[in-house]
Amino acid sequence: MALSLAQNCVPSAFNPLVYGTEIKSLESHLVTNYSASVPEAYRYTSPSVELQNATFCNITVTYTHPGQNDSIVAEAWLPTEWNERFLAVGGGGWVAGRFFLSYNAMQGALADGYATITTDAGLGSSVEPSQWAQTSPGNVNLYNLQNLGSVSLNEQAIIGKSLIKSFYGQAPKYSYWNGCSQGGRQGLMLAQRYPTAFDGIAAGAPAINWNKLFTFIQWPQQVMNELGQWPFMCELDAITLAAVSACDELDGVIDGIVSDVKQCLGTFDPFSVVGESTTCAQLNGTRKIITSAAATVLNATWHGREDYHGILPGADLTGNSPRSFGQPGIAATDCTEKGCAGTPSNLGTSWLKLFVAKHATLDMAKLTREEFDSLAYSGTQQYASMIETSDADLRAFKAAGGKMVTFHGLADNIIPPGGTEDYYNAVADVDPEVREFYRYFEAPGLGHCFGGASGSPTGLLHQLRDWVENGTAPEKTPIKITVGNATHDRILCPYPQTSVFDQDCGDASKAGCWSCSGGVSVANRAKRSAQRWNEL
């Protein structure tokens, strides 16, 4: 079987036609003795795995939409030892796919026997969009943005299924999607706009409400610019640690994790630590007094803009603390003994400058609040239908038999979890039987897609597959958390339920001492924060 499949790995064996496209080139070659170590961090919903001596057909399809001057590359890996299933993977940040995170996910898929595919949406692998955002100064390349937003995703599914049928002589029995962040947004877009593309979708920390999200990512920097003060990162880190210390035991267990983020957001006052001192790495280890400006920036970031949620207490905001785990901070500053300047994320600045204002040299540091708010509104006006993925009507996905699971870390330091909660609630408003096809898991302590005191929900993809193929919906999912130097077993529960520790059981390190509590209806739910930040 493997030998005959290997003989099929020639360009002439494939003809992946997609209506409205034209194939520019198709290359294939057989890869043998391929091995890789894949960490769980890059798989999101599956455990770490060792890929050993795999043999697969690597197929690269380059195509265009005639008249649009684009060039999209889809890359598929078809293993000779196949489980008769298809797993497509997503991208991250500004990248649709075909970069290191996608390739790690594909390596993991191969190890589990899946045929797998990724696409670059015609954008290449650059982590920032300046190379493709505009056709000329002031003119956005709407075709490229459309390809990133939606079009290439459906084509990725069609091409993948066509290649699979040509190679194996049969279509996949089941098709799945797995992604986080940009990949999570892509998963939601597939469920909303292409409801028959995949049987099961795992969409972690999705970048829903794209314009509001990317505007919010710039929000802490805007607050600092308006204040005319850019706090030392050690000040923000110290307030974050104070919040963790104050809110840790709200769930009845002291473990360094803020689980009851809503109560923490409503009760902990960041201004309560103003005037205290903290050791500051940006000042070569000397002490720094925590300023009111630092508390103001952090408070604004926690509560979010008037129309959008904020990052929650416990999440790293600087990328400089032990809680960052190498992830960037949206409230980062660059400091010397003379003072600090803001260091904004290119996610927010690139979006607002290149796409919304269409002005690559716009000085973001000089925007007034009125100008900033105007940009935010304009972005939604221009691009909501193209990339937002906020459509809550998933009835076509449900009717097609689709199942979806979403997770979001409550210590996510880039994408506010409140947006994912709001989306699930909105879906429930359209279809009160949402649990029949869609479940959402909040993960206390988990950072953006991975990292943090909590591990990733590594059983979720297997549970999704069991739901699709056997009708067994996930009632909980296992995770591991780090407490000091020890690893504890816990569970996550489908929203709106939460995991609760049984004090009589006595051992918080055992998953059996935790259970899901609360009703399953999202009716009469409380908003995550009653406050939105309107004034400095």
Predicted regions located by residue number:
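Histidine-bearing beta->alpha loop at or near hydrolase active sites
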Residues: 438-451, 483-485
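A catalytic-pocket lid/entrance helix-loop region that shapes and gates access to the active site
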Residues: 189-191, 196-306
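Catalytic-loop region of hydrolases
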Residues: 1-85, 97, 103-104, 257, ...
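Secondary-structure transition/capping motifs at alpha-helix termini
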Residues: 80-83, 112, 165-173, 194-200, ...
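Gly/Ala-rich beta-loop-alpha elbow adjacent to hydrolase catalytic centers
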Residues: 178-183, 187, 412
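Cap/lid segment of the alpha/beta-hydrolase catalytic domain
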Residues: 92-169, 215, 364-379, 384-386, ...
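Conserved alpha/beta-hydrolase "acid-adjacent" motif
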Residues: 414-418
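Short beta-strand/loop motif that positions the catalytic acidic residue
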Residues: 405-408
